[in-house]
A protein has these predicted regions:
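Active-site activation/catalytic loop segments of kinase-like enzymes and analogous catalytic loops
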Residues: 221-257, 271-290
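Conserved protein kinase catalytic-loop anchor
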Residues: 185-187, 205
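Catalytic-loop of the protein kinase fold
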Residues: 187-189, 194
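All-alpha amphipathic helical-bundle segments outside canonical DNA-binding/catalytic cores
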Residues: 259-271
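Activation of the activation-loop gatekeeper triad in protein kinase-fold domains
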Residues: 208-213
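Juxta-kinase regulatory segment immediately upstream of eukaryotic protein kinase catalytic domains
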Residues: 1-20
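ATP-binding pocket architecture of kinase catalytic cores
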Residues: 26-149, 156-184
Length: 320
């Protein structure tokens, strides 16, 4: 690492912790198309520096300053998240924040397939429901910058793609024609799924990646982990490739008293697939336009067609 950049990390961690520390060599972790994640130890304490990447992958992503505030609110509400230490406005030219580095597995495919995590997978449905109930109890007034999402926002985003995608358009039409009764909006994680959690042999360690937090129907958050893309090849396990939906829904209803019905999950599962399909297209266009040449973004363009196929499957299920 260039000496000046390392010094910037040293200064940032010192500022965030509020004390002089010596840090290890920062290591850039794999993944994270929209944010960088750097592992670093400060006087032996494991930390993670979350830093803005070049450009903005999605226009509705929170700034890191706002994401840090959401993380802090979640931590203080009792949600299992990394301890937030401090926000830094300028780390080598980009904003960042410093938080605890949790130990465990984060790679989705490993979480759903590793034999040593089999027992954990049995615990995760109830554990995920318990944490999501806490997320939805975060006082919205603490986070006045959060905006409300809507089906209409997805329509606008698809229009900006400016090419025909009839499966997505049909999905959006169906969603507008079959809206369930609106529930009271709550603070939502916005990307609550396997791949944004830390897991060890005892189950859930913590929730990560709060950059899509917003105000919404709680069932939208509850159902996002059902999207097929987040099953990582274990398609028979509808809940994120780890298990069945029933214990997850039962535990969430028990804790919140909302009495969410399975057909509501079905509706928002389709909405989640439509949102992810549009996300794949818009991110792939960053590569195709030359704005941000990236193999990862190009791959998302191919994945988008798989999600469109899933939308057709879910529409067929809805019509049965």
């Amino acid at each position: 690492m260039i000496a000046d950049v390392r010094e910037a990390f040293q200064a940032a961690v010192t500022e965030a912790l509020g004390r002089e520390v010596e840090i290890s060599e920062p290591v850039l972790l794999a993944g994270g198309a929209s944010k960088e994640a750097w592992a670093v130890d400060a006087d032996g304490e494991p930390l993670l520096v979350r830093r803005a990447a070049v450009g903005v992958i999605h226009r509705h992503t929170l700034s890191l300053a706002h994401e840090f505030e959401v993380l802090r609110a979640a931590f203080e509400t009792g949600v299992k998240v990394p301890r937030p230490y401090g926000y830094v406005a300028d780390l080598a030219g980009r904003e960042a924040f410093v938080m605890e580095r949790l130990e465990g597995e984060t790679i989705g495919r490993r979480i759903v397939q590793k034999p040593e995590l089999e027992a954990a997978r049995g615990l995760l449905p109830a554990q995920l429901a318990e944490e999501l109930a806490k997320v939805h109890a975060i006082p919205a007034e603490r986070l006045p910058f959060l905006t409300a999402a809507a089906i209409e926002r997805m329509v606008e985003e698809l229009d900006e793609v400016d090419e025909p995608h009839p499966a997505i358009e049909l999905g959006l039409w169906w969603l507008r024609e079959n809206r369930p009764p609106a529930r009271q909006p709550v603070v939502c994680h916005g990307d609550f799924r396997i791949g944004n959690v830390v897991v060890d042999e005892h189950g859930l360690v913590g929730l990560l990646d709060w950059g899509f937090a917003h105000l919404d129907d709680p069932v939208r958050d509850l159902s996002f982990g059902l999207v097929r893309a987040w099953r990582f090849g274990m398609d028979s396990r509808r809940l994120g490739g780890i298990g069945d939906v029933e214990p997850y829904l039962e535990r969430y209803n028990e804790l919140t008293g909302l009495e969410v019905r399975p057909e509501e999950l079905d509706y928002w599962e389709l909405a989640g697939n439509v949102a992810w399909a549009i996300g794949c297209l818009t991110q792939a266009q960053r590569h195709l336009s030359g704005l941000d040449r990236s193999v990862e973004l190009a791959i998302l363009g191919r994945l988008g067609s798989e999600v469109e196929y899933e939308i057709c499957h879910l529409l067929e299920r809805a019509a049965a």
